Amino acid sequence: DLKRLLAYSSIENVAIIGIGIGVGMLGLTYGNPYVAVLGFAGGILHILNHSIFKELMFFAAGSVYLKTHTRNMELLGGLMKKMPYTGLLFIVGSIAICGLPPFNGFIGEFLIYAGMIMGIPASEISLFLVLILSIAALGMVGTMAMLCFTKAAGITFLGNPRTECVEHVNEDVPRVMLIPMVILAFLAFFIGMFPQYFISIVMWPVSMLVNVDKYAANPALDEVFKNTFGLILSDFSWFFLIFFAVVAVMFIVKLIVNRKARISNTWGCGYNRLNNHVQYTGSSYANLFISTLKPLFKRVSHIKKPKELFPKEAYYELEIEDIEEAYIVKPLVMWDEKFLTKFERIQNGNIQQYILFGL
């Protein structure tokens, strides 16, 4: 479910914001203004960034649903040819949400990383261990985010149409739906290219969290946050912008030189009865990662192997059950629902009684 994937991704980004705020609190606790300001600034800036690229992703997912009437990625594929603008904007959002330059998702995470790294040299052993583990955790989160959204973008927009849900799509969504996505994509790019202006903005709420008067006499602090990090981030973004521009020019030159597209079947190891189902799915793409986390998932597979020289039927079905969700989260939710249903009598439609409850 494409939208459910985005909803779970919001939990991940809230956790990144929490890491930033936690780093800021550690900086306050241990009297390190650099760590405090960088942590709070990164966390608050990521709140803004998340509100931009996640809206873009949900708009793109809604456009896909409008045209295909399904949110199941396993039924899609090949939409890039039919919905090129939506596909491109979804990829832009995916790059931003993975924390890659030159888009805004990179900026907040960079500040959080910088805060943790700057806190390592002058920290006690307990803080040192916490920061090292936090850096490793944030790096692992970024890796899983890239795995997640390369899957989402690739399975949804690349390859060939898997079902009739995609076959009937003839054109992209109307301009009135594309314009908001273009604006959000531009904002994500603009913040990534010129982060110093937005760092100055988030310094206002950061100054309320950090006792600015205590560090006002330290001119180096102001230099670090208003100039140094902003310029470093800007240099990073310009470097990657030039890199992407060179790649784009090479791609355009290739199109001009070789305009004729060559279409051929995928090599099937001698099996020549291939169809659009014989391609990667979301489950098969994530299979290697899931296999490394066997204790957390229950895998149930159904296989019918080809036995004849010219097999007529063969299939492989895989069901993955989240053990934590099935045996911990769902029982707690069911117990919570049973408990709260006992209070249904309070909701009787009487406004006067509701006012009395408020009083």
Residue locations for each model-derived region?
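Aromatic-capped, Gly/Pro-kinked transmembrane alpha-helices
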Residues: 197-241, 252-359
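Alpha-helical multi-pass transmembrane bundles of energy-transducing inner-membrane proteins
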Residues: 2-72
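Hydrophobic alpha-helical transmembrane segments in multi-pass integral membrane proteins
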Residues: 18-31, 98-101, 187-197
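Short amphipathic alpha-helical coupling elements at transmembrane boundaries
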Residues: 74-81, 115, 155-159, 291, ...
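Predominantly late transmembrane helices and immediately cytosolic-facing juxtamembrane segments
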Residues: 54-58, 131-170, 233-264
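Membrane-interface segments at the starts/ends of alpha-helical transmembrane spans
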Residues: 36-38, 119-134, 217-238
